[in-house]
Amino acid sequence: MSSLTSVELNFLVFRYLQESGFTHAAFTLGYEAGINKSNIDGNMVPPGALIKFVQKGLQYMEMEANLSNSEVDIDEDFSFFQPLDLISKDVKELQDMLREKKRKERDMEKERDRSKENDKGVEREHEGDRNRAKEKDRHEKQKEREREREKLEREKEREREKIEREKEREREKMEREIFEREKDRLKLEKEREIEREREREKIEREKSHEKQLGDADREMVIDQTDKEIAGDGSTGAEPMDIVMTPTSQTSHIPNSDVRILEGHTSEVCACAWSPSASLLASGSGDATARIWSIPEGSFKAVHTGRNINALILKHAKGKSNEKSKDVTTLDWNGEGTLLATGSCDGQARIWTLNGELISTLSKHKGPIFSLKWNKKGDYLLTGSVDRTAVVWDVKAEEWKQQFEFHSGPTLDVDWRNNVSFATSSTDSMIYLCKIGETRPAKTFTGHQGEVNCVKWDPTGSLLASCSDDSTAKIWNIKQSTFVHDLREHTKEIYTIRWSPTGPGTNNPNKQLTLASASFDSTVKLWDAELGKMLCSFNGHREPVYSLAFSPNGEYIASGSLDKSIHIWSIKEGKIVKTYTGNGGIFEVCWNKEGNKIAACFADNSVCVLDFRM
């Protein structure tokens, strides 16, 4: 018979402490016992292994005590012991207890027999039983009448709630109608203003026709020179290490090209443009998300005195600013018909374009940090502080599978295709998971700090990651080690983005690149194939929290805690537009046309910038 080694026992106790939430005790035992040096595969040890092991031992002692007792008939009922007796006594003491118990049972049986023989009131007892049965029947009928009354009360309450819901729907319908009327009115005003602007521009064009012709000639010469230098799109030239800094010709975005969206009462943590309409979603620490209807075209064509209306998606029934319901992340589905939000209460919510809450998804036991729709739109993926990722079946409004691989909070998730995805965590690990599989399809190890962000390239063959260890890495699904280790940053890298160029994009003939934003105040651009830095954009003075490529891949927008948004020309390697607000910037994003940029600020505002070059 094989025996349990001390190393195996230590590991079982270590796992028990972890599963029971005794984190510090588990850490101490793991350190002193050298758990991390053992060869035991933790994935092969099922949850609750120590408890099952101890229970089996107790059952064995119980069977030994019963079967080894010669005074006990094995055909009789099996006798059970209290767990404390099994732990504190040996087999002989248990057998003595069993014999004593049997003797008492025999004595009690004899006493019952004598009682039956001497009992002369058997008939009276039968009469008492009948009376008790009648009383019980009467009591049951009384309870049935009470249940009927409670059922009627519940039905009345449901009817009252139904009426209240109908009233609430009517109020919401009226608010939506007002919102639509206001939107139509703004659209009409915008069209009129655009027409007037066109007339003015026509006059200006006629006045400066000669000057424009001269400018056009010069632009053609410059463009031709650029093409000759670049080899007209040739890929034969070696990439160069270029460090770019802002120039004195930086163009500050005028106030006429800016709209400040006010309404949130706490810092705005996330924003995202709809992929199908001119709608902007924002999520805030005030326990609300908002859907803003942004006018199309230039802001100059829209009356400056008009506010931009928003639908308010309340995550708390009472007052806002409930910190447990901070909206930390949000994402539109591919069709732009549904918005998903994740919050600090551990719940994901799904909303319609009209601001109607259609699903509340509850499974996590901690705040949700990341949330993504798959391309098909049938699954929603969430990552939480509770160290798990959950795939939700949106149509069924229920969780399909929970993935519990990480030993620390899950910081980011990203779909590779409709059924597989990557997760990253504070435990420095990256896992490739697949729906229906109970173990990771692949494990990527190499980072020495928290992995803040993971992103798949447009083809789903390369995975980029960034970490507090000041590195970004590029991984290939065909191997477990990283393909490129990008080490030019000097501080933590907070986020990364793939360019919308190369295979699998709308710009297939352009080079695929990776951009990274760091606490060292820089944005760096990398050659994805060679793993070499192409250029470093040095213009911010504080950590850079967010960056986004324009849809055509020609520009990068970056947002920093220095309150500034810089828009960089990748071709020229310099800032071409900039805007400074009143708070640190947590996220920036482009609309699908590439003519507007949104940013969310720590001063409770959302900013939308017109961008035209």
From Swiss-Prot:
It comes from the Eukaryota. It is found in: Nucleus. CDD domains: WD40. One of its GO terms (biological process) is response to cold. Keywords: Nucleus, Repeat, Repressor, Stress response, Transcription, Transcription regulation, WD repeat. It holds the Pfam family LisH. Residues 5-37 form the LisH domain. Its main location: nucleus. Residues 101-174, 193-214 are annotated as: Disordered. WD repeats lie at residues 263-302, 322-362, 363-402, 405-443, 446-485, 488-536, 539-580, 582-613. Gene3D superfamilies: 1.20.960.30, YVTN repeat-like/Quinoprotein amine dehydrogenase. This is WD40 repeat-containing protein HOS15. It comes from Arabidopsis thaliana. The lineage of its organism: Eukaryota, Viridiplantae, Streptophyta, Embryophyta, Tracheophyta. The gene is HOS15.
